[in-house]
Amino acid sequence: MTFRNCVAVDLGASSGRVMLARYERECRSLTLREIYRFNNGLHSQNGYVTWDVDSLESAIRLGLNKVCEEGIRIDSIGIDTWGVDFVLLDLQGKRVGLPVAYRDSRTNGLMTQAQQQLGKRDIYQRSGIQFLPFNTLYQLRALTEQQPELIPHIAHALLMPDYFSYRLTGKMNWEYTNATTTQLVNINSDDWDESLLAWSGANKAWFGRPTHPGNVIGHWICPQGNEIPVVAVASHDTASAVIASPLNGSRAAYLSSGTWSLMGFESQTPFTNDTALAANITNEGGAEGRYRVLKNIMGLWLLQRVLQERQINDLPALIAATQALPACRFTINPNDDRFINPDEMCSEIQAACRETAQPIPESDAELARCIVDSLALLYADVLHELAQLRGEDFSQLHIVGGGCQNALLNQLCADACGIRVIAGPVEASTLGNIGIQLMTLDELNNVDDFRQVVSTTANLTTFTPNPDSEIAHYVAQIHSTRQTKELCA
């Protein structure tokens, strides 16, 4: 038997993990084992919301060392993280300034300023990326405007996964899928857009040309002295998750469900027309030159904050209590900027309901019900927008990532969207990370080949839409009202 041992470092906004994958060539089987899991979260430092990158690096090294201590020969390592955030370095490779997190308020008002000065359509035609107030474009503008004293010291700007790869290897890389999330990469050239960089105040010399997934960045020397290749995987965690989504045919959509929910479809070409711009659709880079045509949705961040504020530890009990409540008594727009990082999420949700003359969710279960109903309704709206954009309905929706373990939300999504939902795999980002490593090691031919492996090894659960559910009737009523308004317009 021929085995490959690949290690995926998968960092999310709330946790990180070091996972060992064992691939058996002859039977094309893939097994995952968690080596080390650790917390991640936002910190307050000198008036900014930041990441503790030193703690994250220590946790990564600890996890890798644990694998080596077991006597396992590692064939390769890959790192994926969330998008848009970066670390600045000087000529000696030392950090400049703080690793500020995207939920910091320093970018307030800058997206509007960019649209006024550069033109919203021009920015979109150049980047093809969704307008989000925390995109790297606006973060760099905030930095160069608010902390100009740092500029003379900056030699390099590395996105988060590239920074951690650099810390392991001493080699710098700018991986393409994550680079596209910045709103600074030109969609036609796949290189940094000079006009957008100029507006941000950043120097193009801070960046190297983006590289597509599948190259070896450098090597990490383990405690035993072995040199282990560090592969540039699809380093944006959603790009990795999509690789591991067992999409079956062109009519399949995906939803990467976690702190963020990202819903979209794969395409060989980007969508940058006026319809896409009006819907605020993003065209992020994917593996093998594909585009991830998708839309960002605030996701389970809202529920995570409620759990934290109410000190709820028994999530299954909360979900059971939530399921017993009637649907759609309280609904909000999860994508409202007010929910990005409020002081108190529970109070913010209640205020939003109060302002729209709805009942106020008071109990833990009522707050959770408000969130899951609102997410399912937004999923239905976004799926409809995506279908209109491409001119064809979807036949099924694949929900992947940690959020796919929420059976209530999966069923609500199926009912609201009126579409079959297939949930799994849970560890989609990790698996997609491993998939690129196996392709780099010449064990697999391409993404479609890897998806066949995932389909046969992952635990998948199907949710069939119930047209008689409360939320399905609610959606039908909304659509009927919209059509009436359109006829009367």
Curated annotation (Swiss-Prot):
Pathway the protein acts in: Carbohydrate degradation; L-rhamnose degradation; glycerone phosphate from L-rhamnose: step 2/3
Segments passing through the bilayer: none
UniProt-listed InterPro entries: ATPase_NBD, FGGY_C, FGGY_N, Rhamnulokinase
Active site: 237 (proton acceptor)
GO biological process: glycerol metabolic process; rhamnose catabolic process
EC category name: transferase
EC number(s) per entry: 2.7.1.5
Keywords attached to this entry: ATP-binding, Disulfide bond, Kinase, Magnesium, Nucleotide-binding, Rhamnose metabolism, Transferase
Molecular-function GO terms, alphabetical: ATP binding; glycerol kinase activity; rhamnulokinase activity
Positions with a binding annotation for substrate: 83, 236-238, 296
Disulfide pattern: 68-222, 353-370, 413-417
One GO CC term on file: cytosol
Required cofactor(s): Mg(2+)
Reaction catalysed by this enzyme: L-rhamnulose + ATP = L-rhamnulose 1-phosphate + ADP + H(+)
A matching Pfam family: FGGY_C
Described function: Involved in the catabolism of L-rhamnose (6-deoxy-L-mannose). Catalyzes the transfer of the gamma-phosphate group from ATP to the 1-hydroxyl group of L-rhamnulose to yield L-rhamnulose 1-phosphate.
Assembly with partners or alone: Monomer.
Alphabetical list of PANTHER family matching this protein: L-RHAMNULOKINASE, SUGAR KINASE
NCBIfam families hit by this protein: PRK10640.1 (NF007925), rhamnulo_kin (TIGR02627)
Record-stated family: Belongs to the rhamnulokinase family.
Annotated protein name in UniProt: Rhamnulokinase
